């Protein structure tokens, strides 16, 4: 009792979860040490051995759990306790029956998302090195199931891979609905699943759920950190498509700007089917609606003040003398100048739409204001179509195949050789995920799915084509995007 009191005082300074963990460990060790002494020949034996087995199971110490369960069976003739002991042994046997070298894979290989599933599978196959496998070389096995992009198929796939194929872990799925359904089932069956989806909050489904994919919130946070923190842009405009994608990124960007102390000066949406964006752009710079007289007067005063500071930029004072009221009337009839009170413009749309939108800005007398975008901008076609209008644009990316990294270069060359096409982010992500898991299996210390889960958290020595991969305590990959900028006719990594 005195030892337990001392332990309680010691644990009081820690967070509740650590104090509980410490207490459980202490009790387990104490019970294990004195079990024979206190349990021999009395009615408490089954209770003690059952508690020991339960604690060891929770700690994933299966050898000790098995020993305690067998002691439980031997300690009593009562059928109730014997049955509990056998159930524990069956559970241990089931946990140890997984195939540590076998990985399950859930991808949409048919249906509307098949093209994305196939690209991901290409990367996974390349990562398994199936094209250069030497005879007799140890390798992991991949069991693939087609989700068809449907949540129901994803759930069935998890059940089959976990209960029948007995895989150690699962990669996938890709699509949002399939991923959330598969994650919930994987958590229920206590099998690690590394999802490849952008779905926010998916790792909240449980401790067995991981994600290896760049999520929008991290991408925008990185973009704003560069724009506000380093380039010192402060004022922003947002021009976004009236779609779920556009609205999502508009809100994400706006929230991020607010959090970092920036300002949103203009926000306009457009119909995704539009090809003329003059109205929206004019609204952003005060050219669409009649200007109040107070604003007109303020702009005139600003213009006079600027002329006094920079007289060489103003008109010759002798010019127009003698024209009197005619000159003033002509000045009033001139098209007003745009009010560009922002330092950058954020457009969350794909490269095809951006190529249509960008030329409208100089056409409406808006020059030298850089664009910010999303990873959907990443295409050489954007530069081919509208390169002159998107110079200095910045956007995040999860993978840059033109990187000078040897790791990336070798991956791109191997992918082209085997698939006769260039890899994208999905192929790169699939490649890195399977390589990461291969390295875990190669360590040879994994016996159960819980072991595998713990190794995922602890492994921090993998550098792949999408960057360094480690996972935080919530199962989210800790990986920053690269920021790309357009200079001349090429994309470059922003230093």
Residue spans for each PLM region:
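Extracytosolic ligand-binding ectodomains
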Residues: 1-10, 30-495
